[in-house]
Amino acid sequence: MFCPACGHDYPIEAGVMVAKPYVSDNNKVSVDFYNSPLWPKFRFWEWFTFLCNGGERRSRDKVLRYLPKQPNLKLLDVAIGDGVYLDWLPSDWSVVGIDVSTVQLEACRKRAGTRDLKLILGEAEDLPVQDSRFDAALSIGGFNYFNDPEKALREMVRAVKPGGTIVVSDEIPNLTDRMLFRYIGLPGVDRWIVSKLFKLGDEFTDMVEKYRTLDIPGIAERVLPGCRYERIWMGVGYVFVGQVPE
C-alpha cells in the first residue's frame, strides 16, 4: 500500500499494513507483553477494574463521550489494541487503527465486521498518515508507555484537521502508589503482585515503575494548550481532551 504521507510502499500482511515490523525500547516491551500469553491473563484484572466502575462499556464511555458527534467521522485510533469498543462507535464512522502488536491487530480485524476499518502495524511516534486527514484522534490504554508520549501526541495533532478533537486516556502513571505495601515501606511486595499476580510480567512491571512520575498534564498542556484533563474510573485513570489549533 502506498503512503502519500511519506512516499513509501508498505506491504499488506493478513489485512494489516506493515509500516514498522520491528520496534525498540518501551514499544518492544509492549509488543512482548501483548503478543504473549500474559495479556489474556491480565485482561481479567482490566475487566475487574471496569466492573468496579459500572462495567466495561460504561467505563470506556467516560472516554468515548468526548469524541465529536458527527456523521461519517474519520477517526484515527492510536494503540487500537483488539478494538473492543469498535461496536460502540457509530457504524458510519471510518477508522484507521495503529498498534505495535500483531496479535492485537489480528483480534481487532476479526472484530471489525463490516465497518470501514484500516489497520496499521507501526508506532505512535511515526504515524504513516497524511497531515490533517482525520476529524479526530483517540488513544486509550497505551499513552503512558509509548517510547515518546509527547512526540506521539504531536503526531496525532499533525494527523487531525485544524479544529479537530484529540482524546487520550490511560491509567494514572503512579497507580502503584495506591497499593498497600508501598504505604508500609515494602514496595517490593507490590512489585511482585503487579508482575506475578496481575500478570504484567517483569519487563512491563519495570517499565511501570520507571515512568511512575510521568507528567501527563504537562505533556498535554504543552501540545494542546487549554486542553481539559480529568481523573476517571474512581481516580485510577485519566482522560484529556483538546482541539487542534486552527
Show which residues each predicted segment covers:
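Short cysteine-rich clusters marking metal-coordination/redox-active sites
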Residues: 3
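Conserved class I S-adenosyl-L-methionine
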Residues: 14, 18-70, 84-85, 104-107, ...
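Class I SAM-dependent methyltransferase SAM/SAH-binding core
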Residues: 74-126
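A short acidic, Gly/Pro-enriched loop at the edge of an enzyme's catalytic core
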Residues: 125-136
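A short SAM/SAH-binding and catalytic strip from SAM-dependent methyltransferases
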Residues: 136-148
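A short glycine-rich, Lys/Arg-flanked "PGG" loop and its adjoining helix->strand segment in the class I
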Residues: 150-162
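C-terminal alpha-helical "lid/dimerization" subdomain adjacent to the S-adenosyl-L-methionine
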Residues: 167-238
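C-terminal lobe and adjacent flexible extensions of AdoMet/dcAdoMet transferase-like proteins
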Residues: 239-246
